[in-house]
Amino acid sequence: MENFHAQYVMLETIGHGGCSKVMLARHRLTGSHVAVKMIRKSECWCNPVMSEVELLMMADHPNIISLLQVIETKKKVYLIMELCEGKSLYQHIRNAGYLQEDEARALFKQLLSAMNYCHNQGIVHRDLKPDNIMVEKDGKVKIIDFGLGTQVKPGQKLNLFCGTYPFSAPEVLLSRPYDGPKIDVWTLGVVLYFMVTGKVPFDAASIQKLVRQILAGKYFVPSRLSVELRDLISLLMTANPKLRPTVAEVMVHPWVTEGSGVFPDPCEEQMPLKPNPAIVKAMGYIGFQAQDIEDSLRQRKFNETMASYCLLKKQILKECDRPIRAQPMNPSVTPFPSLVDTSTFHLGLRRRETEPTSLRLSANRQMSVCGRSTSKKRDRRFSWPSVSGRPLHTTHTMDHTHTRTRSVPCIYSMFCTIQPNSSDDSTEGHTSASAEDKPVRSRGWPRGIKGWTRKIGNVMRKLCCCIPSKETSHVGHSRVSPKK
């Protein structure tokens, strides 16, 4: 069984919920930061149809958060995920007030691509909202939370009534068996409305009034929006789910296809059958076997080998995208082995005889993961009430916003009330991030395989992005009704 603390250094807690905690951690071999969701087996009372980890194992799309590794112990399950560099769509819109149609279209097309991929895989999200969508600094979108997701067969009806009230489709609030993909389409409509107005279409002082608004299907839309956009919003939020379009049909709507630009390629980040020889060779110097690397990627084992390869590949791709300057090396930081400089090969072999336990977790994850700042200073952030699988209730949270430097963050629970961060387990393998613990930075990208692999150890870095939030008032609304 793999040892978590032998592979990762815990830095700080960035989210906490009823049966799980999200930590910021550093991968020891590469220095990369990751988000780690720790789930206590004894506290997992939630029981969805399919667990979040199983859905993430199935998903491989450039606009869906990547699961890198799963480590299971007797008491806990560790989900190691990529850490996005950006902030939530909610924060992004709060900073801007609302988005212009061109920017909204660019982001929305990525959401459509991801959700079309999910629906083709039989995956239903059921909790799409701006908090669960990350926007990276380059404008790339990542859907990060599948805690309420499940897998369905064509024509299968669902009866677990969950989600977030302002984004819930009428059929969910009526407690009727529903078509999973169609409620995702409704939610996409609410998200699109929020993107171009800065507000949700349905808002009320109480849950009862909010439910009545949604069931009545009456909402306001700014008169400044184009005719095509208003038509698309109306289609997405069609009250009758049978008349609501599929995601594939939405992708050919005139507003979506307007202008240049293509949809993200679902194959963009799929694992190659053959790993990069340079990375394999570099990993071989610290005990990884080439055949094990290839098998781990091809079979998507989500083990130490797969995580190490993916993190190294991401570092190299990031390094290719921007020039960097050299900095003095921290003597306390061990450089990653280079194929050229054999003096760096004083690392012990990382391989152990045992491989990670094969894992198919029971369906019991109900915690959402959203972006959260690792900085000490935070703004206030707003959270919408949720629809529970139990009797409907409101999850009370404070109205606050917060900037993020890298992404996975706060935990929302549709079933568990959010709890303040506790010290329990926070010291388990915990190591505070030191200001002196800075990676090596090189002058440029050398040519050739040897130069390429030499860069592997010099690409660790820390990013910081602090953007103040502001609100903008909006006027000029006209009442419309969704198509019946």
From Swiss-Prot:
Superkingdom, natural source: Eukaryota
Keyword Nucleus tagged: no
Enzyme nomenclature, EC number: 2.7.11.1
Tissue: Testis-specific. Expressed in the testis from 22 days postpartum (22 dpp).
Domain UBA, chain residue ranges per copy: 272-314
Keywords per UniProt: ATP-binding, Kinase, Nucleotide-binding, Serine/threonine-protein kinase, Transferase
One MF term in the entry's GO annotations: ATP binding
CDD domains per record: STKc_AMPK-like (cd14003), UBA_MARK_Par1 (cd14337)
SMART domains the record matches: S_TKc
All residue ranges annotated as the Protein kinase domain in the record: 8-256
Record's keyword annotation contains Nucleotide-binding: yes
Pfam families the record matches: Pkinase
Additional record remark: Encoded on the T-complex, a region of 20-30 Mb on proximal third of mouse chromosome 17. Naturally occurring variant forms of the T-complex, known as complete t-haplotypes, are found in wild mouse populations. The t-haplotypes contain at least four nonoverlapping inversions that suppress recombination with the wild-type chromosome, and lock into strong linkage disequilibrium loci affecting normal transmission of the chromosome, male gametogenesis and embryonic development.
Similarity annotation: Belongs to the protein kinase superfamily. CAMK Ser/Thr protein kinase family. Smok subfamily.
Name of the protein in its database record: Sperm motility kinase 2B
Organism of origin: Mus musculus (Mouse)
UniProt gene name: Smok2b
